[in-house]
């Protein structure tokens, strides 16, 4: 990625964003906003929904497992924050309020393949549009490894507008840590949409601070 992005130039912009705005009484997040151009989002192949693992996540995600049988035991041993059983899923049927609450309560979900038809019927209409459908864990995959990865990921989505918004840090983190997080996101994005061709602007901002605009010419290597 260093061949595409000038690290030092981007690091200066991160430092500028961290110093901007007033002090707040809470720990502000640092957000990355990427604006793309020349992408026809009416074509399904141009919409993306990626999970990118951050080298220095600002917080660890909360993970819940839809589970039963051996998978339930594996999920508990992997240290998930909650287990929702088959019976509990069946009890959610038709209860949109409870399903919405569940979707907000956890960052990511996992499930075994055999539960997916039930989950598709019960939670799919609400979880699907929110990008919260469970990650399917095949029988031969170590559940703990999946959970540990999901603790550190952010979701990168491109759907109706050519704009991506991702939390890449928080106040108190070193600028270099936030830089490596941003580079991880940009690297994945560059694989799908080469930045030299499709990047319009980058913005970095804290939760309550004005964004720092970064033009492609300022950070893309020549």
From Swiss-Prot:
Gene Ontology BP annotations = regulation of translation; translation
Cite the CDD domains for this sequence: Ribosomal_L1 (cd00403)
* Domain of life, per lineage: Archaea
> InterPro entries under this entry?
Ribosomal_uL1, Ribosomal_uL1-like, Ribosomal_uL1/biogenesis, Ribosomal_uL1_3-a/b-sand, Ribosomal_uL1_arc, Ribosomal_uL1_CS
> What GO molecular functions are on record for this protein?
rRNA binding; structural constituent of ribosome; tRNA binding
Tell me the SUPFAM superfamilies matching this sequence. Answer: Ribosomal protein L1 (SSF56808)
| Keywords, in A-Z order | Repressor, Ribonucleoprotein, Ribosomal protein, RNA-binding, rRNA-binding, Translation regulation, tRNA-binding
Extract the Gene3D superfamilies matched here. Answer: 3.30.190.20, 3.40.50.790
- Name a Pfam family for this protein: Ribosomal_L1
Q: Name one GO cellular component term.
A: large ribosomal subunit
Subunit text = Part of the 50S ribosomal subunit.
Q: What does this protein do?
A: Binds directly to 23S rRNA. Probably involved in E site tRNA release. Protein L1 is also a translational repressor protein, it controls the translation of its operon by binding to its mRNA.
Family, according to the entry, reads as follows: Belongs to the universal ribosomal protein uL1 family.
What protein am I looking at?
Answer: Large ribosomal subunit protein uL1
Protein encoded by which gene = rpl1
């Amino acid at each position: 990625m260093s061949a595409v992005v000038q690290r030092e130039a981007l690091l200066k912009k991160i430092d500028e964003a961290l110093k901007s705005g007033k002090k707040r009484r809470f720990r502000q997040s640092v957000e990355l906003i990427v604006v793309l151009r020349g992408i026809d989002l009416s074509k399904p192949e141009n919409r993306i929904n990626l999970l990118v693992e951050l080298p220095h996540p600002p917080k660890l995600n909360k993970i819940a497992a839809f589970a039963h049988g051996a998978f339930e035991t594996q999920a508990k041993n992997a240290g998930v924050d909650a287990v929702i059983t088959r019976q509990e899923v069946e009890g959610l049927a038709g209860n949109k309020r409870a399903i919405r609450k569940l979707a907000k309560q956890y960052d990511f979900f996992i499930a075994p393949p055999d539960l997916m038809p039930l989950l598709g019927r019960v939670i799919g209409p609400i979880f699907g549009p929110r990008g919260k459908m469970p990650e399917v864990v095949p029988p031969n995959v170590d559940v703990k490894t999946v959970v540990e990865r999901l603790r550190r990921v952010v979701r990168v989505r491109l759907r109706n507008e050519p704009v991506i918004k991702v939390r890449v840090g928080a106040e108190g983190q070193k600028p270099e840590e936030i830089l490596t997080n941003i580079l991880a996101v940009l690297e994945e994005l560059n694989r799908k949409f080469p930045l030299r061709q499709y990047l319009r602007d980058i913005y970095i901002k804290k939760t309550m601070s004005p964004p720092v605009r970064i033009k492609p010419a300022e950070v893309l290597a020549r």
